Amino acid sequence: MIAGMPALTHKQQQDAVERIQELMSEGMSSGQAIALVAAEIRENHTGGNVAMMFDDDDMINDSDDEYHFDDGEEEEEQ
C-alpha cells in the first residue's frame, strides 16, 4: 500500500513531538495524542507530500486482541 504523507521540516517534526508530549503530560494516552496531532497536521498542512510504502501484511492482524513481545531473552522454566 502506498500513502501520501505530509512532508515536514525538522522544526515541524519537533513541534509535533513537543505537542504530543504536552498532551501526554495532561493525561492523554500516547496513541490518542499521536492520532490527534497527526489529524491536526493533515488538516493544516499546506506543503508537499511524500509517498510512503506500507507492507500490507502489517495490516492483516490489526484486529488481533493478543500481542506478543520478544525481547530476545529465553524464558525461564517454571
Curated annotation (Swiss-Prot):
Residues 54-78 have a biased composition (Acidic residues). Pfam families: UPF0181. InterPro entries: UPF0181. Belongs to the UPF0181 family. Residues 49-78 are annotated as: Disordered. Signal peptide: none annotated. It comes from Pectobacterium atrosepticum (strain SCRI 1043 / ATCC BAA-672). This is UPF0181 protein ECA2377.
